[in-house]
A protein has these predicted regions:
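Short S/T/G/P-rich N-terminal loop/turn motif that feeds into the first structured element of a domain
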Residues: 1-124, 140, 156-159
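Structured core of small recognition/catalytic domains
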Residues: 116-175
Length: 175
């Protein structure tokens, strides 16, 4: 099995139906031997971010399209910071999502080494809990999830670990 990040924009009518769409996605993924790891919706309910544990990109695309979701992005990702079992128990904890478009030429090994060196520095901002990161296998971007009292604290935490921010979104777990 592999992890796939799916981003989908939601139109106003879909916002009310997101639970039904995710139920359909779960059923489609299950038919392909997969499962939804988590689904987060941006605060304004304009975008849903889904992580699927499924056999391959083709199976992920098929499941998402059959669930009626429009795919804006579908990429293989690597999980950093928690294992799948921990996510299933804690996925409702994260309330902020930070996006970072990774610089060209950065390797996964270099990224992981830097992450390991810098992660202890999050202790400088104790009100923020780093939850997990999904790093696109093509090294195009990463999504970092945090539990935090507010956006300013997330920004301070990112500064503590010298990590850039391209976007910060308040999120809510929906599955």
């Amino acid at each position: 099995m592999a992890l796939f990040l799916i981003e989908s924009k939601l139109i106003p009518g879909e916002r009310r139906r997101i639970t039904q769409m995710l139920d359909r996605l779960a059923a489609e993924a299950k038919q392909a031997g997969g499962d939804i790891v988590e689904a987060q919706v941006s605060e304004e309910a304009a975008r849903v971010i889904i992580v699927l544990d499924i056999g391959d990109a083709r199976g992920a695309r098929h499941a998402v399209e059959n669930a009626g979701l429009d795919i804006q992005l579908l990429k293989a990702v690597r999980l950093v910071g928690q294992d799948l079992q921990a996510i299933k128990q804690r996925k409702g904890t994260a309330n902020y999502l930070v996006e970072w478009n990774l610089p060209a030429g950065l390797s996964m090994d270099a990224y992981l080494k830097r992450k390991a060196e810098k992660t202890p520095l999050y202790a400088e901002v104790p009100e923020v809990s780093f939850e997990r990161t999904y790093v696109c296998e093509d090294m195009s971007k990463c999504l970092c999830l945090y539990a935090s009292p507010d956006e300013d604290a997330v920004v301070r935490a990112r500064k503590a670990v010298s990590a850039p921010i391209d976007a910060v979104n308040k999120i809510k777990n929906v599955r």
